[in-house]
Amino acid sequence: MSLALSYPHDPATGSPQPLPAEALWAVAAQLRAVVARDGSPWALSTHALVAAVAQLQVNGRRIASAWEFGQRVHDASGHEVLGVFETDPSTPGLALVSVNRQLIGDRPDLELSTVAHEVGHIVFDAPPSVTEPTRRYRSVTAGPNCLDGASARAERRANEFMGALLVPPRPLHLRLVARARSEGLPMVHAPHRGRPGSRVLPASTQPDALAGLTAALAGDFGVSDRFIAVRLRRYRLIAGDGR
């Protein structure tokens, strides 16, 4: 049975309406809830995530995905890239994803982030191919910097979805509070986007203490320290540091 996801969209084309971050987080939560866990209550795995999106219904449109991990992947200029997402007019409703394991190397965190980013494209950019069978779409993930610093709307959307899928606001806040308490670190009341009623780190948190917390949280969620740092900012879990 395929997972059904929904979000505001153009009913004629299937294209997403402009979605605020919180709406993207909500869609990510729908998907995360059904991804099987491989021994961790916090971290997702590449295998489980790919399996979860094999068949989807997105706003009533059936989307299948086919994944390739064994080949090198290049952009239109011939440069090697981390991943490519495509739809093809000959196979409407099928998302074609290639992930370059040779380029990723021994970085399971980078592979997971790349896969989650491409899942964002499946969820938001594949549905129009169902009702527009002549439409071809191609998105390239050139390198790690694309996973937290994109400019195009579709890439920013895929990145925000990826962030909330792998490291959601409330679970991250819960782990942050637990780890800060275990280290005896102070916390303060401040506006945030995480777990209601919980405190956040003060802006005065020492850099070495913050680095240690960030590394521990990265281990909890199976992502990089940089990934966690971005999510802490996005969820405003450090007082005065939200964007």
Feature names for model-found ranges:
Residues 1-243:
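Active-site hotspot residues in diverse enzymes, especially metal/ion-binding acidic/histidine motifs
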